């Protein structure tokens, strides 16, 4: 049994909204990264569902690209978090406005 496209898009929209709220409302850089990952997963779900509904492999190709983008985002974000924590800082997002300055 194939799930209807409207159901897949509704779940993707809900997942995207949860990720957007999490990324916008949180102060911790780790929780912001998790919110962005939710949003990327929602986009991948929408692409995969649309590809399945229209019998097209472009949706699966887009999911592979999104997975690569998500892994690059996670790597850069966690490197930023480790860099900030090693400098005696915190994981709060508002403390990252002065990374380039010498203090």
From Swiss-Prot:
Group of enzyme by EC: translocase
Entry's Gene Ontology molecular function annotations: NADH:ubiquinone reductase (non-electrogenic) activity; quinone binding
GO cellular-component term (any): plasma membrane
Residues annotated as transmembrane: 1-21, 29-49, 62-82
GO biological process: ATP synthesis coupled electron transport
A Pfam family the protein falls into: Oxidored_q2
Region (Disordered): 84-103
Membrane association type: Multi-pass membrane protein
Highest rank taxon of the organism: Bacteria
Assigned keywords, A-Z: Cell inner membrane, Cell membrane, Membrane, NAD, Quinone, Translocase, Transmembrane, Transmembrane helix, Transport, Ubiquinone
UniProt biased composition (Basic and acidic residues): 88-103
Protein task: NDH-1 shuttles electrons from NADH, via FMN and iron-sulfur (Fe-S) centers, to quinones in the respiratory chain. The immediate electron acceptor for the enzyme in this species is believed to be ubiquinone. Couples the redox reaction to proton translocation (for every two electrons transferred, four hydrogen ions are translocated across the cytoplasmic membrane), and thus conserves the redox energy in a proton gradient.
PANTHER family, per database record: NADH-UBIQUINONE OXIDOREDUCTASE CHAIN 4L, NADH-UBIQUINONE OXIDOREDUCTASE SUBUNIT ND4L
Quaternary structure note: NDH-1 is composed of 14 different subunits. Subunits NuoA, H, J, K, L, M, N constitute the membrane sector of the complex.
This protein's name: NADH-quinone oxidoreductase subunit K
Phylogenetic lineage: Bacteria, Pseudomonadati, Thermodesulfobacteriota, Desulfovibrionia, Desulfovibrionales
């Amino acid at each position: 049994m194939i799930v209807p496209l409207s159901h897949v898009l509704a779940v993707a929209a809900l997942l995207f909204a949860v990720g957007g709220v999490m990324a916008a409302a949180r102060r911790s850089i780790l929780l912001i990264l998790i919110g962005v990952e939710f949003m990327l997963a929602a986009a991948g779900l929408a692409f995969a569902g649309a590809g399945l509904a229209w019998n097209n492999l472009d949706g699966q190709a887009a999911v592979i690209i999104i997975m690569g983008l998500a892994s690059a985002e996670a790597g850069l974000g966690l490197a930023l978090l480790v860099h900030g924590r090693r400098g005696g800082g915190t994981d709060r997002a508002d403390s990252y406005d002065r990374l380039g300055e010498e203090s």
